[in-house]
Swiss-Prot record:
The name this protein goes by in its record: ATP synthase subunit a
Organism expressing this protein natively: Symbiobacterium thermophilum (strain DSM 24528 / JCM 14929 / IAM 14863 / T)
Function: Key component of the proton channel; it plays a direct role in the translocation of protons across the membrane.
Subunit structure: F-type ATPases have 2 components, CF(1) - the catalytic core - and CF(0) - the membrane proton channel. CF(1) has five subunits: alpha(3), beta(3), gamma(1), delta(1), epsilon(1). CF(0) has three main subunits: a(1), b(2) and c(9-12). The alpha and beta chains form an alternating ring which encloses part of the gamma chain. CF(1) is attached to CF(0) by a central stalk formed by the gamma and epsilon chains, while a peripheral stalk is formed by the delta and b chains.
Entry's transmembrane regions: 34-54, 103-123, 133-153, 195-215, 216-236
Gene name in the database record: atpB
Length: 257
């Protein structure tokens, strides 16, 4: 996003509008083209893996530290937050790696659009539907895998076959609704901010960047929370099925007197 914003500012000053690509495009013109967006996502994943490695070493060291104490408080808070949607702290702890990974990837992707690198900025990957659709598909597959693990293959298939047309359509639409919501919000933000900076290039950037940081974090929270809600719906169905497998409990005949 930053590249686009500053390019617009240059264009308004009479300079040629041109966007530089920070990385070379590999295998260009083929089905296996590796463009700047893909390389940017690889860099995000590499950065998150490095961060996870550093944090893991700090936690497993066993030595008391401010970082360790802060992480314990953060984990406790996240467990409580996710448990309010998933149903229990046990389940929240079990699926926190997935949820936290999604959150970190999305928020870093959103914030890349605010990196102030004139002429060689990085676009927010989440401002492209291909990225958000991939995230939506990952969530959809993860939810179905969780359903199979909790209900069993037979129970999952029975659940799918018993869905009504609207419920089945809802299951299919989930990844698209998630991806379009995130893509639309980030792309709309980039477009709006580009127009604002084009109109007021000297006074707009700082408050607009602050707004982008808040908005980027909010979108990451929304996407992760909706994922937790989808997982919670699967687990809720499993718990209801465990208590009343075929509905016999509600319809047991009264004992004869």
């Amino acid at each position: 996003m930053t590249t686009f914003l500053f390019s617009l500012a240059e264009a308004s000053g009479g300079k040629e509008f041109h966007i530089h690509q920070p990385f070379p495009v590999l295998l260009q013109g083929t089905y296996f083209e590796i463009n700047n967006m893909i390389i940017t996502q690889w860099l995000i994943v590499a950065g998150l893996l490095a961060l996870a490695f550093v944090i893991n070493r700090a936690v497993l060291s066993g030595r008391p530290s401010k970082l360790r104490g802060s992480l314990e408080l953060l984990i406790d808070f996240l467990e409580g937050w996710f448990a309010s949607f998933i149903g229990s702290r046990q389940y929240a702890r079990q699926y926190m790696p997935l949820l936290c990974t999604l959150f970190l990837f999305i928020i870093v992707s959103n914030y890349l659009g605010v990196v102030p690198t004139v002429g060689y900025g990085l676009f927010a990957p989440t401002g492209r539907w291909g990225t958000t659709l991939g995230l939506g598909i990952v969530v959809a597959i993860a939810v179905q895998v969780i359903a199979i693990r909790t209900l069993g293959a037979g129970g999952w298939l029975k659940h799918i076959l018993h869905l009504g047309p609207l419920s089945l359509l809802e299951e299919i639409v989930h990844p698209f609704s998630l991806s379009l919501r995130l893509f639309g919000n980030i792309f709309g933000e980039e477009t709006l901010l580009a127009v604002i900076i084009f109109l007021a290039p000297m006074i707009a950037p700082i408050p607009i960047m602050v707004l982008s940081l808040v908005f980027g974090a909010l979108q990451a929270v929304v996407f992760t929370t909706l994922t937790a809600i989808y997982i919670g719906a699967v687990l809720e169905h499993h718990q209801a099925h465990a208590h009343h497998p075929e509905g016999e409990a509600e319809h047991e005949p009264a004992p004869a007197h």
